[in-house]
Swiss-Prot record:
GO molecular function: ubiquitin-like ligase-substrate adaptor activity
Protein name (database record): F-box only protein 3
Residue ranges occupied by any ApaG domain in the UniProt entry: 278-408
Gene Ontology CC, one term: SCF ubiquitin ligase complex
Compositionally skewed regions (Acidic residues) per UniProt: 419-449
Lineage of origin: Eukaryota, Metazoa, Chordata, Craniata, Vertebrata
Keywords: Nucleus, Ubl conjugation pathway
Region (Disordered): 419-454
SUBUNIT field: Part of a SCF (SKP1-cullin-F-box) protein ligase complex SCF(FBXO3) consisting of FBXO3, SKP1, CUL1 and RBX1. Interacts with PML, interaction is direct and takes place either alone or within the SCF complex.
Principal location class: nucleus
Biological process per Gene Ontology, one example term: protein ubiquitination
Amino acid sequence: MAAMDTESAPLTLESLPTDPLLLILSFLDYRDLINCCYVSRRLSQLSSHDPLWRRHCKKYWLISEEEKTQKNQCWKSLFIDTYSDVGRYIDHYAAIKKAWDDLKKYLEPRCPRMVLSLKEGAREEDLDAVEAQIGCKLPDDYRCSYRIHNGQKLVVPGLLGSMALSNHYRSEDLLDVDTAAGGFQQRQGLKSCLPLTFCIHTGLSQYIAVEAAEGRNKNEVFYQCPDQMARNPAAIDMFIIGATFTDWFTSYVNSVVSGGFPIIRDQIFRYVHDPECVATTGDITVSVSTSFLPELSSVHPPHYFFTYRIRIEMSKDALPEKACQLDSRYWRITNAKGDVEEVQGPGVVGEFPIISPGRVYEYTSCTTFSTTSGYMEGYYTFHFLYFKDKIFNVAIPRFHMACPTFRVSIARLEMGPDEYEEMEEEEEEEEEEDDDDSADMDESDDDEEERQRRVFDVPIRRRRCSRLF
C-alpha cells in the first residue's frame, strides 16, 4: 500500500533532481534566467548557479577567464555589474567590442602610434550632454562604441585609413564625440548629420544621419558629394558607405584585420585587392588593388575617380639571366557603356624599373570614368638585361572598378522640368570638356602635398584631376 502511495505521489518542481533542471536552465537566455528567480525558491537557487552565467558573460560582454580572475568575482556578479554599466547596449556590445579588440590586436605591432592615439571611453553623462547639445538622440551602437573608445586624437595617420597620390593626400581620423558635436549639421543638404571622421588635409568627413531627413535613412553612413551642376547649395548627393554604424565600423575592421587593406609606412591604405586579379607571365607576376576616391568624384556631373596600386614581382627562383627592364605600357580601358580607349606610353610613373629574381616593384596611378564602373587591362613590354634585343610582354590582369552605391540629392529630385533640362545640357557640356582634358600620365605616391585645414560647414571644393594611366 505504501509503495502504491509513493508511485502515485505527484511530481513537483521541488522533487525533481538538480542536474536535469540545471541542464534545462542552461538553454535559457539571461532574461529568462532572471525571471526564473521569481518563480520559486528552488528555481531562484538554481538560477544563481554560477556556471550558468559564464556563457552569458562570454556571449554578451566577451569577458575572458583571465578577466574574471583579475576581478575576483563570480560570473553572475560580473554579468550584473557589466549590465549595470552598459546594459542598454547589450544588443550591440559584443559586435562592437570584438571589432575594437581585433583592430587593436592587429594594429599594435604594425601601427603602434595609431593605437596610442585612441582615447579612453566616454561616460554616459558625456553622451547624454552631446544629445542635449545637438537636440537629437545618438544611435545606440554609436554610443556603445564611444563608451569603449571616444575616438582618437587628431593626428596623422588616421584610424579610418589613408590614400596618397603625388598631389593629393587623405587620412581620416575618428572624431571624439565632443568634436563631432561641434560639426553637427543643421544646414540644408546635411540636416541632422553628425561627422564620424575628419581629414585635416582635405576637409573630408564621413557622416552618420542621426535622423531620417532629406531622403536619407536614419543611421546611414555616407560621404557627402555636392551636386556641382545645381545652383542650390542644398543639393548634396551621397556615396553610401554603411547602413548603420555597426555595419560601417565592423566591415571596415574586417577589411583591415583580414589583410584586405595594406599597411604602408605605418598607415592603413584603403586599397581593395581581388585575389583573382593576378597574372603571371613566365617568372613575373603582376597583381592589382584599387580604391575609389569620393573626395575627387562627383555624381553630377558624372566623374568617378579611382586609384590603383600595381605590384610587379619576379620569382626568387628565376635564373639571374632573366633580369629585365620595363620599357613601356599598354592599356585598354573600358567603361560601363562599352566605350574603349587605348593608351600606350613609355615606362611607368616616369621610371623604367629593373626587375630581377626576388625583387618587387610597386607604383600607384589613377583613372577616371564618366560611368559608375569600368575596367582596365593591358601589358608591359620588357627587355632582358643580358639579351637587350630580346623583348617580351607581361600581362596586366583585368581589374574592375566601381563606385559605392549613391543617392541623388532630394533637392535635385524636386527641381522643375525646365531647370532640370538646363542642368542636363550643362552636364553634357561638362562631360565633353572632361573628355578633351584627359591626359596620358602616371602618378607615383612618393611626394605628398598637404592641404589647408577646413572647417566642417564649408563644402568640399572638388578638384578636377586629369585621367592618369
